[in-house]
């Protein structure tokens, strides 16, 4: 393993199957595109659906147990309904009885009572006929008739005179011991030759006793044929998987309108497809009902591959006979057979849905064929190569990639139907290939290798080096047992999630923190425009955000290596740009106006401060440097210096202790520098309004990994270690960060003697021909287990607050009022003024975020949302999702003003409501909308012109007057949400202007937010409506009728609550208002109110005014006065 990378990757294990011994013969496993589910088959062939976020098993289904229950039902039914064997045995018993007791009717009667056949005087061969109609022949006496449907007909007793001289009845034998469910199609019965009476009598009891056993044996033989065998493939097949496979260009507006179509009921088409050695089963994971796929060609040999289509009911099976069979899941029959593939087992199928449905197949014969599914014909066939191991289709480029047995990757273009390129895999033997887009890796192919267990990234152009993740070092650092990677599955919508079948366990490994595209934005005062800078194709590019969909990518003179991953950061003033190379540690600071290099060097990490009072002066630049302190045990000398790129130990007795030095300086004419010596484990920082320092905790246990910069890192107290059982979460900012893995790579390869010159010179890094490997990282994904992140003040370098769990990213508001701290599965929103305190917590894992006027726009795995942080949570706005569902539903309707002044999101790939596939980065909010960037560095713009969204943003900015003007354009059905939004922010009076909510609901909103004065202004409006006979809507409780008396009681409640809040004038107003609605109780409360405030004059006036009309309350007041 090469240790040239100094990067501490942000990969972490978010799921691991615990205590399970999973069969690895075929590795059946799949991951759901929408729900956090995986499905796999355990060692007992049970189908397990498990939630990989909380480890909860949602389904544990046993097909074999289902078959056993079916067998028991058949046997139970068999006991109730006699079989033909039982009839034959009873018939032979009658023969013996008749011969030995001729003329005796009692024996015949007893046998008839037991359901046996009696002798007819006119027929020597009595046979029970069991036909499709279930009728009973007149020649049989007391026979239970069985229809084809399994129904039982009441026995019919026929009285007949037995003839003692009649010949013996031949014995009945059923072919193959046929039973109710295992009968020949024509229901034929074979008659044996006439046997002797004595033999029949001797064998009568044996036939009766063995009857049930023979039937059971036959049933077991047939059920053995139905045994599942080992499970080869398992897939989710429901409406979500079909929707995610639909990646055709959505250029029609009708595509958006079709989203509102009624979806099928839950569970109707939600299947798990199980392909085993002996059977193909569709399991409805809601009802747990099974449906068998009966294909005669697969009775002896099961299919080798399965593929699905998004908008057709076909499932394609690649068989061992070079045939492809299309199974129609609606008709439940074979729709077509695609013949013409040369001899050889078809190992892989891929569905291609462009303009029509096409299917690509590849086999051991070395041919790659393209089929037209609609016509069933062979569209094209590429030249023969070596045996095809795996296939992949890239819907972005329209290319087909074929992995061959001779360690090559064949790339075909379906537009030109020609071979594009041929990439060599070197000496590595891979078993799988997938198209891959990940901003962290410049490569665009994902390959899996069994042993050593590695996931490798290749480039189709061959211009970049191979980049590999060593899963054996990542998940098994003890090196006691080498791991084997049997299968790797890429998440359909989240390419940073890799589902790995490693040894006998299932892992989900994520590189989420570094998967989103790297970019920075700044405001150009000269052009009055925001500009975004990003690495692309070996150079630093810039684009204007004003016309982001039409502007050209401007190439700057700054050249970047294709083999590097960079972290970009910009100064608060927007004048300076820092570029930090993750692997080599080189950094440079550029002046954007001239692209002049102001400073360069080496550092573990760099960061900029947030905006100060004067952004041109109060901006600071910070960097981390690793220093070493070497101690010679003989000379007792200490030396201190910057750690060079290559450290070679010349004396065995030397001990090297590594330390971290934090340097910050004001980036102006003064260049005042501050230094802070940190612990050896602190090797990463984050910028913003406050300086964040990451610290990796050390544990002393077996299998520890020493973190250093190569050379002889001793066991001194300064060396950082992390064990295989460490609970620390290694996090990273966008684009990755920090370097702590050189010694990791060094130690992980000591046993293999591959550690010479592990810490290669960073200047020679790009020229190295060896592949770059991921360092071994052991993580758990649980941030609560470790508080290893500390915020510091930029100017004093003193800690601010307590230590926090290490976040993935901190998003600071430009107005310095809010910040969002993102963790793996949740994020916090903090308010910075007047004190640093938490506002809210959301259980969502965000991948990117941007602030705009106190509104947070963020992206998750499946959608793009915006929230309006407040101590009282409000409903988020869903701007786009992978399924196309948004909120509000009319977000992009013309009537709501959404598309009236804005351009479409993308004319080629998606409409505004559909989130681009894969990780995205939110860049900026401007006049055109929300600008975002995908992993291919393609720009998108989501319009933000819906009036409800504008209202929320204006209200969040405290621009209430503008928000109320905008509210008049919003559909009244959203007025309730708007009123709630206003009242929790202290503006209940503005709710009175909204016509979409009733006065009673306005009153409830004011009461819930303790706006008592405003609520009393609404009471007269409601009472007037009641007096005039108008209907009063009670949205909270439709069963409760709103009357004058109930309004009076509500006014009394308002007065009491106002008293508790010391709002005495409001309380007095409420009690006085209640005297006209509920006078008895209101006068008492008003009198008590005056007594409490010692207003005796007002109390006397009240007594005099009610002395005649309400004498009881007047007497009570007299007691108060006395």
Curated annotation (Swiss-Prot):
It comes from the Eukaryota. InterPro entries: TSET_complex_member (IPR053290), WD40/YVTN_repeat-like_dom_sf (IPR015943), WD40_repeat_dom_sf (IPR036322), WD40_rpt (IPR001680). WD repeats lie at residues 298-337, 342-381, 383-422. SUPFAM superfamilies: WD40 repeat-like. Residues 88-131, 178-215, 731-775 are annotated as: Disordered. PROSITE patterns: WD_REPEATS_1, WD_REPEATS_2, WD_REPEATS_REGION. Residues 178-190 have a biased composition (Polar residues). This is TSET complex member tstF. Residues 88-126, 191-215 have a biased composition (Low complexity). Component of the TSET complex, a heterohexamer composed of tstA, tstB, tstC, tstD, tstE and tstF, which may act in plasma membrane turnover. tstA, tstB, tstC and tstD are likely to be the core complex members with tstE and tstF acting as associated scaffold proteins. Keywords: Repeat, WD repeat.
């Amino acid at each position: 393993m090469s240790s040239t990378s100094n990067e501490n990757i942000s990969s972490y294990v978010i799921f691991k199957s615990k205590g399970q011994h999973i069969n690895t013969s075929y590795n059946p496993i799949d991951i759901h595109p929408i729900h956090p589910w995986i499905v796999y088959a355990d060692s007992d062939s049970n189908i397990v659906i498990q939630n990989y976020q909380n480890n909860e098993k949602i389904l544990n289904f046993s097909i074999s147990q289902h078959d056993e229950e079916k067998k028991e039902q058949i046997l139970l039914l068999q006991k109730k309904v006699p079989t033909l064997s039982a009839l034959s045995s009873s018939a032979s018993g009658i023969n013996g009885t008749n011969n030995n007791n001729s003329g005796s009717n009692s024996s015949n009667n007893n046998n008839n009572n037991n359901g046996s056949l009696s002798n007819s005087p006119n027929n020597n061969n009595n046979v029970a006929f069991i036909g499709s109609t279930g009728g009973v022949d007149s020649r049989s006496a007391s026979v239970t008739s069985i229809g084809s449907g399994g129904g039982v007909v009441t026995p019919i007793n026929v009285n007949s005179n037995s003839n003692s001289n009649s010949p013996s009845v031949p014995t009945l034998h059923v072919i193959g011991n046929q039973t109710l469910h295992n009968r020949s199609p024509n229901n034929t019965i074979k008659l044996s030759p006439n046997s002797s009476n004595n033999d029949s009598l001797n064998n009568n009891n044996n036939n009766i006793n063995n009857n049930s056993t023979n039937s059971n044996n036959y049933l077991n033989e047939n059920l053995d044929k139905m045994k599942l065998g080992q499970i080869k493939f398992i897939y989710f097949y429901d409406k979500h998987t079909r929707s995610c496979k639909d990646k055709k260009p959505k250029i029609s507006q009708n595509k958006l309108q079709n989203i509102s179509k009624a979806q099928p009921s839950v569970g109707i088409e939600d299947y798990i497809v199980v392909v085993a050695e002996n059977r193909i089963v569709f399991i409805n994971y809601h009802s747990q009902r099974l449906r068998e796929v009966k294909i005669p060609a697969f009775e002896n040999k099961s299919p080798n591959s399965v593929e699905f289509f998004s908008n057709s009911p076909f499932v394609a099976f690649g068989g061992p006979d070079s045939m492809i069979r299309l199974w129609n899941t609606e008709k439940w029959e074979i729709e077509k057979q695609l013949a013409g593939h040369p001899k050889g087992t078809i190992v892989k199928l891929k569905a291609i849905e462009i303009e029509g449905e096409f299917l690509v197949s590849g086999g051991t014969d070395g041919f790659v064929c393209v089929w037209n599914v609609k016509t069933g014909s062979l569209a094209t066939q590429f030249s023969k190569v070596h045996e095809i191991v795996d296939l992949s289709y890239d819907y972005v480029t329209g290319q087909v990639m074929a992995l061959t047995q001779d360690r090559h990757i064949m790339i075909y273009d379906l537009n030109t139907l020609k071979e594009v390129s041929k990439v060599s895999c070197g000496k590595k033997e891979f078993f799988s290939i997938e198209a891959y887009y990940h901003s962290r890796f410049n490569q665009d192919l994902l390959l899996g290798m069994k042993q050593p267990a590695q996931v490798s990234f290749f480039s189709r152009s061959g211009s970049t080096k191979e980049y590999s993740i060593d899963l054996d070092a990542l998940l098994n650092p003890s090196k006691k047992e080498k791991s084997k990677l049997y299968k790797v599955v890429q998440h359909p919508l989240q390419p940073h999630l890799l589902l790995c079948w490693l040894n006998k366990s299932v892992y989900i490994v994520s590189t989420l923190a570094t998967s989103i595209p790297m970019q920075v934005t700044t405001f150009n005062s000269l052009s009055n425009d925001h500009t975004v800078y990003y690495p692309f194709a070996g150079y630093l590019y810039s684009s204007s955000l004003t016309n982001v969909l039409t502007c050209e990518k401007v190439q700057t003179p700054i050249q970047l290596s294709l083999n590097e991953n960079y972290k970009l950061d910009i100064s608060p003033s927007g004048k300076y740009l820092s570029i930090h190379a993750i692997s080599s540690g080189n950094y440079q600071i550029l002046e954007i106006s001239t692209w002049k290099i102001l400073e360069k060097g080496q550092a573990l990490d760099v960061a900029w401060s947030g905006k100060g009072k004067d952004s041109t002066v109060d901006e600071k630049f910070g960097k981390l440097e690793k220093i070493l302190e070497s101690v010679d045990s003989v000379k007792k000398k200490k030396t201190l210096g910057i750690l060079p790129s290559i450290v070679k130990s010349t004396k065995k007795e030397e001990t090297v202790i590594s330390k971290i030095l934090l340097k910050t300086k004001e980036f102006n004419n003064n260049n005042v520098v501050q230094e802070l010596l940190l612990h050896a484990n602190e090797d990463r920082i984050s910028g913003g309004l406050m300086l964040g320092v990451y610290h990796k905790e050390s544990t002393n246990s077996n299998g520890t990994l020493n973190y250093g910069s190569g050379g002889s890192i001793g066991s001194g107290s300064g060396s950082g270690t992390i064990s295989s059982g460490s609970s620390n979460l290694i996090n990273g900012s966008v684009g990755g960060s920090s370097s702590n893995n050189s010694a990791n790579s060094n130690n992980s390869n000591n046993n293999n003697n591959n550690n010479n010159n592990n810490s290669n010179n960073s200047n020679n890094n790009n020229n190295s021909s060896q592949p770059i490997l991921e360092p071994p990282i052991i993580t758990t994904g649980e941030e609560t287990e470790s508080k290893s992140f500390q915020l510091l003040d930029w100017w004093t370098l003193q800690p601010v607050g307590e230590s926090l769990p290490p976040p993935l990213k901190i998003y600071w508001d430009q107005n310095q009022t809010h910040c969002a701290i993102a963790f793996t599965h949740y994020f916090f929103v903090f308010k910075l003024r007047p004190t640093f305190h938490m506002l809210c917590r959301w259980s969502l894992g965000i991948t990117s975020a941007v602030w705009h006027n106190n509104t947070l726009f963020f992206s998750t795995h499946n959608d793009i949302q915006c929230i309006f942080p407040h101590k009282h949570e409000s409903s988020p706005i869903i701007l786009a999702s992978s399924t196309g569902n948004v909120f509000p539903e009319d977000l992009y309707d013309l009537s709501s003003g959404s598309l009236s002044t804005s351009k479409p999101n993308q004319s080629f790939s998606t409409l505004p409501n559909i989130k681009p596939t894969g990780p995205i980065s939110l860049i900026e909010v401007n006049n055109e909308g929300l600008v975002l960037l995908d992993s291919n560095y393609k720009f998108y713009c989501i319009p933000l012109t819906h009036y409800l969204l504008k209202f929320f943003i204006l209200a969040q900015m405290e621009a209430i007057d503008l928000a109320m003007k905008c509210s008049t354009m919003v559909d009244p059905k959203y007025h309730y949400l708007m009123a709630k939004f206003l009242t929790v922010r202290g503006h209940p009076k503005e709710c009175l202007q909204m016509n979409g909510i009733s006065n009673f609901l306005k009153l409830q909103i004011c009461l819930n937010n303790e706006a008592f004065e405003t609520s009393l202004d609404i009471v007269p409006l409601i009472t007037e409506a009641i007096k005039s006979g108008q209907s009063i809507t009670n949205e909270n409780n439709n069963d409760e009728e709103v009357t004058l008396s109930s309004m009076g009681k509500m006014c009394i409640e308002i007065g009491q609550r106002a008293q508790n809040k010391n709002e005495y004038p409001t309380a007095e107003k409420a009690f006085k208002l209640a005297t006209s609605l509920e006078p008895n109780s209101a006068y008492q409360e008003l009198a008590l109110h005056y007594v409490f405030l010692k207003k005796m004059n007002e109390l006397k006036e009240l007594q005099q005014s009610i002395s005649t009309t309400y004498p009881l309350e007047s007497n009570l007041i007299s007691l108060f006065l006395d």
